[in-house]
A protein has these predicted regions:
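Catalytic-pocket segment enriched in acidic/His residues
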Residues: 1-128
Length: 128
């Protein structure tokens, strides 16, 4: 969601940090600069939405893998995989941080609030 204070140019300049903290003490951290992606975010958005692809409530555009984890998690040569209880945090100075705890889908409440519901909620509270 863009406004006068945050634009596509801010996306293009964003530097992101991803941190995984496991309940057993495992830590993985990496960073990525949006300036290094191969296609412009505005071009990608234009390819995703148009006359043949409508999204009345908007859509989320994922811009690629920040980095491929190469740190072994459970022993040499075993690679990386998430574990239940991991805290995954993605942050950038301009937006702050988003943190989620890894759980299995059968143990979490269903996702029922989309972008349209968010906008209605904000409008009802006079925040738009």
């Amino acid at each position: 969601l863009f406004d006068a204070g945050y634009s596509a140019d801010d996306v293009r300049r964003a530097d992101l940090v991803l941190r995984v903290e496991g309940p057993e003490g495992f830590v993985l951290e990496g960073s990525s600069s949006m300036a290094r992606i191969s296609r412009d975010p505005v071009d990608l958005a234009a390819q995703a939405i148009g006359a043949n692809h409508q999204y009345p409530d908007g859509f989320v555009l994922f811009l690629g893998t920040m980095f491929a984890p190469v740190k072994d998690r459970h022993g040499p040569g075993q690679g990386f995989t998430h574990a239940v209880g991991d805290v995954v945090t993605v942050s950038t100075p301009s937006l702050g941080a988003l943190a989620n705890r890894v759980r299995t889908s059968d143990t979490v409440a269903p996702w029922t609030m989309g972008a349209g519901a968010l906008m209605r909620n904000l409008a009802a509270r006079g925040l738009l």
